[in-house]
């Protein structure tokens, strides 16, 4: 069985999650002796799909995040009668969507709000959602639904949108900081940026405000304090993607669909208190956050670019890379590092050069500044 896969270009190039999911798919496919054909996302419209599928079911995996790109892709595949298994997104209304593998956003939001309630926190914000992200839309929908069920009349006032960049999102939130005792961040990039800014402005985490973020890469462990995470592993999504594809492939019946929702796991770190800790009481005025009409694309934001680079860097480094960098950031020379780690000086040099290339940096000093600025030690 061959599995064709199409990945949204920006998501493929800039998101560690896409690499984690693809890695899990490749591992599962290898264990079952299937094959994978990755479709070029820049030219998928001009591909000969009759030649690709021949006499097999017209079915492919689609990994994407942004609503506008996905809408165009699904409209195209509906027209040419190619069925789709969607990963990480819950988007109905298209005849071509026969399967979905996604996080159970409803259950995960309920779990996080229950955790905050057990901690004594009842004034929770949703932070950093990007309106063009299908997963972020789902998180906001279920957050607002749960808050409305809990008696909040205008839950949209508790949601802070990454409308024109994370800096503006933070400014809107900080102007109302005293209204909240807890925050759910939609992803690790938004959470790390929030934690850094709050710490800079003298807001203590978790004493003044508690933070939990969706996500689960090493990025959330780079800030101080380390962030509590609600994670749905990319390995599980990738594995379920292959199993869902196989089921639909062999069923090969238009009436059959298959939707898999995966509950997240909570990784408790330093940004939340134990349930029996008293929550700090605050009072505040109620007002709507400022709005912006600026057209904004998520990965155009400088802060997002820097955090994405950090995330890719952490994903790309092995334990030996980390050992070299930990010495380097302490101003230990190449000669001393090679002696300590029993490596040749050339090996140290080329590993550092590769890491600079990943981060788009030119000099050792730039690398040290990057590591220091991101609390790498």
Annotate each PLM feature.
Residues 110-151, 256-274:
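An alpha-beta-alpha
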Residues 4-6, 56-65, 83-85, 125-128, ...:
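Periplasmic-binding protein-like
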Residues 99-126, 165-171, 191, 232-250:
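Hydrophobic alpha-helical segments within soluble ligand-binding/sensing domains
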Residues 340, 350-377:
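Basic, Lys/Arg-enriched C-terminal extension of HTH/homeodomain DNA-binding domains
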